Amino acid sequence: MKLKILILALIFVAGASFTILTQKEWPVPDKYNKMPNPLKGDAASLATGKELWAKHCQSCHGKSGKGDGSKAAQLKTTPEDLSTSEMQKQTDGALFYKTLEGREDMPSFKKKIPDQDDIWALVNYMRTLKK
């Protein structure tokens, strides 16, 4: 029994390490890194962000943003865990840019969410996902 637990723990650590190593750096232009969020994280903004999260993001990133959504296993790349301190350290502008532009399995939301204030509301909601 102890051997099974040890083997499972090693598999988990190896898988987590592989995921970390395979995450490519995602450079963000300075213009976006320095861009301030024009929306306050008030109740209305968070409600809009939560609704957009459920509609557009939850299937890959999961309800709590850990990258464990129902479609995550079908993707070539692992969805980011938005609850980590590393993700939460990113500027609002960086999160806005990544949502707007997308890359690889992460789609661009320029057309799906054409109102930029809605993307900013989504960024505000992402801030609530921290551990």
Predicted regions, residues:
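Sequence context surrounding c-type heme c attachment/ligation sites in exported
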Residues: 46-58, 73, 89-93, 103, ...
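C-terminal capping alpha-helices of c-type cytochrome domains
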Residues: 98-104, 111-131
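Electron-transfer interface patches adjacent to heme c in soluble/periplasmic c-type cytochromes
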Residues: 79-93, 109-119
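Sec-dependent N-terminal signal peptides
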Residues: 5-13
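Periplasmic/extracellular electron-transfer cofactor-ligation site
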Residues: 29, 44, 54-77, 105-108, ...
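Electrostatic cytochrome c docking/interface patches
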Residues: 24-52
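Bacterial Sec-dependent signal peptides at the C-terminal "C-region" and cleavage site
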Residues: 14-25
